[in-house]
């Protein structure tokens, strides 16, 4: 009896040129990442005008189906949430709930200036969240007011590159050890009241410029006349 056949009864096939052209050598991690980045299912959280730009991707001009994007109506079937528009304090718990209902691994794209920093609504509104990353972790930011559809495609490509280089074991370990989102309390600054009757005592109000009446093409009602009418 041949000892070589006894130790290895099945002969090792020779790797020929024909075999190398038909066999793909990869790892389970790369195969898993390729399947995920080729079938990204987004959940749209549109609250403002930025969502209109994303809706333009559905048409044939941009054709976002080529990236494997399939919009879902349920967070339990989505692995990507795109926040487009202003997020208020009252909407923050609903957004966090939707994010928590998504299965792991999950990703977030912040679209537009209002989502990233609060935008123009954060200057004089105490109910606007100054950045959605205070509520949920953001993977890709898309600046703009609103960003163009090409910018959304660029964000999708960058997210796909990030997904392709990830190790699933490291991501799950990171999720298990640390919290992926945090909430920051918004502090209000006390400012003097602007809506008061003191503005009537300003010099420009007491004595308006002469050319103001001509520009308005109507007579000006001076505070003295108002006081006289009130006394009568």
UniProtKB/Swiss-Prot annotation:
Keyword Transport carried by entry: yes
Membrane topology type: Peripheral membrane protein
Phosphoprotein is among the record's keywords: no
Keyword field: 4Fe-4S, Cell inner membrane, Cell membrane, Iron, Iron-sulfur, Membrane, Metal-binding, NAD, NADP, Plastoquinone, Quinone, Translocase, Transport
Alphabetical list of InterPro entries matching this protein: NADH_UbQ_OxRdtase-like_20kDa, NADH_UQ_OxRdtase_20Kd_su
Enzyme class: translocase
GO cellular component: plasma membrane; respiratory chain complex I
PANTHER family: NADH DEHYDROGENASE, NADH DEHYDROGENASE [UBIQUINONE] IRON-SULFUR PROTEIN 7, MITOCHONDRIAL
Function summary: NDH-1 shuttles electrons from an unknown electron donor, via FMN and iron-sulfur (Fe-S) centers, to quinones in the respiratory and/or the photosynthetic chain. The immediate electron acceptor for the enzyme in this species is believed to be plastoquinone. Couples the redox reaction to proton translocation, and thus conserves the redox energy in a proton gradient. Cyanobacterial NDH-1 also plays a role in inorganic carbon-concentration.
Protein name: NAD(P)H-quinone oxidoreductase subunit K 1
Lineage, uppermost ranks: Bacteria, Bacillati, Cyanobacteriota, Cyanophyceae, Gloeobacterales
